[in-house]
């Protein structure tokens, strides 16, 4: 019902050249993605506390609208369980995960590829959107069905050893971030 709809965000989805609206109403969450080419919008609805959703998406829609819609709804369902997907690339090395965060085009996939090529035992866990889950005793990183430039769909997990925020620069440097910088790097 439009009368009780509350818009939470409006944003662009460049992968499908679409404009997105995300909001809530009395029944739950609503995600609507409208392609700029004039084709039919894709809508997803998920009730509060539900683990399932409904959509009007059809085989004629851009597949990116399906992948992104399911990713958003997965995050809504996973958050109360202490889990969230992060835009990052993850290496597993010696049984622990190292997440590389950064804006698109920063070199996350390149960085993890270089680890695999030059560090024996380094393997890719996920290349775009791993799931991070906090338990009472540790933080874990899980592979996911969403991968990036390098197809990698592993149903595996490991404890997190480090989170590295990448930025492009004319020099190589690494430093530990202060706590407030760390929060900003994750968000």
Across the structure, where does each feature detected by a protein language model lie?
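A noncatalytic interaction/capping subdomain that flanks phosphate/NTP-handling catalytic cores
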Residues: 1-104, 114-123, 130-187
